Amino acid sequence: MDPKFQRVALSDGHFIPVLGFGTYAPEEVPKSKAMEATKIAIDAGFRHIDSAYFYKNEKEVGLAIRSKIADGTVKREDIFYTSKLWCTFHRPELVRPSLEDSLKNLQLDYVDLYIIHFPTALKPGVEIIPTDEHGKAIFDTVDICATWEAMEKCKDAGLAKSIGVSNFNRRQLEMILNKPGLKYKPVCNQVECHPYLNQGKLLEFCKSKGIVLVAYSALGSHREPEWVDQSAPVLLEDPLIGALAKKHQQTPALIALRYQLQRGIVVLAKSFTEKRIKENIQVFEFQLPSEDMKVIDSLNRNFRYVTADFAIGHPNYPFSDEY
């Protein structure tokens, strides 16, 4: 089997490709770029495509996937597509309609994975982040377990093959895992994860529960001022990662991606540049010896790029706990 298509088993029997293509881009990037980049990614060998309602690009990403099916490059079953339930749709009666909305935009019959994007419910409505007159996000009170039951129904209805979560801490995962009458446990927890925030404890916990950790911002994150502190260190400019890149004759990005794969993490690589998209899939062509893995481990400083400040103060804000 082509190493590019390496997959790992999820707890429900489905398989997820270990390397995924991330499609998020800042607001000012034209949505058409997501379509072009997704086509390039599929041509390069990516089979796992990650998007979300929040990214507002599912029409374009769906178009890219369908055009690659139409031209014979892939079949629908070759593609593993992830979408995410946004915070304004946590009320149980809104979960399925939100997924159906994504499917309509995608023009697909099902998603391979549907995940709760963030554990904090926001006031339902058309605004992505509803705010009061002081510019503060308006929270909603929804039991996360009730949202999860609605997710389970989406799986039973065949609209999502697998269901999972994102940005959950240990306590929030345990709330679902210990829920009376739990039908399906989350197959994954998609979180920010890179050498500066290596999530060692959360990874260990997830592995112990058969939950796959999926890494976003694996290359250190975009620099969008609304979401990321502009003084944040640039991961790919780290001298230790640079030295390892030189040693292995790879790019710093490939070192950061390879590090995650060797820890048993499913990793998302985000780039809209053709050259880099094609480079990133070369992550299967080399290995890091354990001493290099230890060097990268030593870079951990629990530094988070995506702090989701809009949700600070919400009872379910996930990043106040240690992990």
Curated annotation (Swiss-Prot):
The record marks F54 as: Required for substrate specificity. Changing F54V: 73% reduction in 20alpha-HSD activity; little effect on 3-alpha-HSD. It is found in: Cytoplasm. The active site is at Y55 (proton donor). The keyword Amino-acid biosynthesis does not apply. Its EC number is 1.1.1.189, 1.1.1.149. This is Prostaglandin-E(2) 9-reductase. It comes from Oryctolagus cuniculus (Rabbit).
